[in-house]
Design a protein with these regions (language model features):
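Eukaryotic scaffold repeat domains enriched in small/polar residues
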Residues: 2-352
Length: 352
């Protein structure tokens, strides 16, 4: 066997070259505060099908069933690997559904996931400019949406989220606005336009709706988070461009827990940031990921892969976040951080 040392960057990733190779660097936290979160475990491994992920980009947890849905974008030259995975935060693999393509029930560039009060799964597809719908066990139910810039039309839809009335809010990314629909696809309202003023957007991405129906939007290219009333009136904003605490370099998603604390995946800064309800910075997390049960089980069954890991260098990097793309809070209050390039979800619990 060759003694050449190889660099390994993620949990069991053996796939094709990544779409983007970020700057590699060792990081050390200089924070003196006690962390408000404790790392729990990791879910996921790189896998072409079945128990694992392939370039996962979105997740959603059903608060009634506990099932977690993960959208796998894969790569354009392996569209058969595009799929939705069903599992749990406790690493129980349930199944998968859909595949890559342009037909009804297929996906191409999945971007956002949300679950309605009837346990149906909704997915935004930024290539197909539509919302697709499945039952909780993966039966295709229908779709809606057309491409364009008029009211109710979509241009690269991104994050999606349901409010308390079961209306679906859609981040209409390339139209730089938020649109509200009934879950059947009837247009209700919209707000936003291109720009950097209050209530304007520059390629917005992720969205969150809190228990009071306030709307939070990750304003991606403006490097900030904006908060709106349920009617779409501007409430506040926080963040600026940079790499310091409270600054962002392309924030991709936002989540709010039951205490009102806010979590932001700071995509190009390779980190998760936590804020209080007023947008004041509380803590910056760099990642503490370990091998998942899925990853360990695969390595246990393959001595060659174990030996390759033992001979690899750069393993100290794999615990850190690499371009975290989505964040969610599950029914138990656990913080879930999704990483496409490391094909995993890091799970954290909030300290009392």
């Amino acid at each position: 066997m060759s003694t050449q040392r190889r660099m390994v960057f993620n949990d069991n990733y053996w796939g094709p070259p990544r779409e983007r190779l970020p700057e590699l660097r060792l990081r050390a936290s200089t924070q003196t505060k006690v962390s408000p979160l404790t790392y729990s475990h990791t879910v996921g491994r790189g896998e072409q099908t079945g128990q694992g992920f392939r370039y996962p980009v979105a997740l959603a947890v059903n608060p009634r069933t506990g099932l977690m849905y993960v959208a796998n974008r894969s790569y354009e030259y392996r569209i058969e690997l595009k799929r939705l995975t069903i599992c749990t935060v406790d690493e129980h693999f349930v199944g998968q559904f859909s595949t890559g393509g342009f037909d009804d029930g297929q996906i191409f560039w999945p971007r956002g996931l949300a679950i309605d009060q009837e346990d149906k799964v909704y997915l935004s597809d930024e290539w197909l400019n539509r919302i697709s719908i499945w039952s909780g066990d993966g039966e295709y139910l229908g779709k809606w949406g057309t491409a364009g810039s008029g009211a109710g039309e979509l241009n690269r839809p991104a994050g999606i989220a349901f409010d308390s009335q079961d209306n679906l809010l859609v981040v209409d990314g390339s139209n730089h606005r938020i649109q509200k629909f009934t879950k059947e696809g009837k247009f209700l309202a919209q707000w936003g336009s291109f720009g950097n003023g209050d209530g304007q957007f520059n390629f917005p991405w992720g969205i969150e709706i809190d228990s009071h129906d306030h709307v939070y939007v990750a304003d991606w290219r403006n490097d900030r988070i904006q908060k709106f009333s349920p009617e779409g009136d501007f409430v506040m904003k926080f963040g600026s461009s940079g790499s310091g605490d409270g600054q962002f370099n392309r924030p991709s998603d936002v989540a709010v827990d039951k205490d009102g604390d806010i979590y932001v995946t700071d995509w190009s800064n390779d980190r998760l940031q936590m804020f209080d309800s007023g947008g004041n910075h509380l803590y910056t997390f760099l990642g503490e990921g370990t091998l998942s049960q899925w990853g360990n089980s695969k390595l246990d069954a393959n001595n060659y892969m174990w030996n390759e890991r033992q001979g690899a260098w750069g393993l100290e990097r794999e615990k850190y976040f690499e371009h975290p793309i989505a964040v969610d809070v599950d029914p138990e209050g656990r913080i879930l951080v999704l990483e496409p390039y490391r094909t995993r979800i890091q799970v954290y619990t909030k300290n009392k």
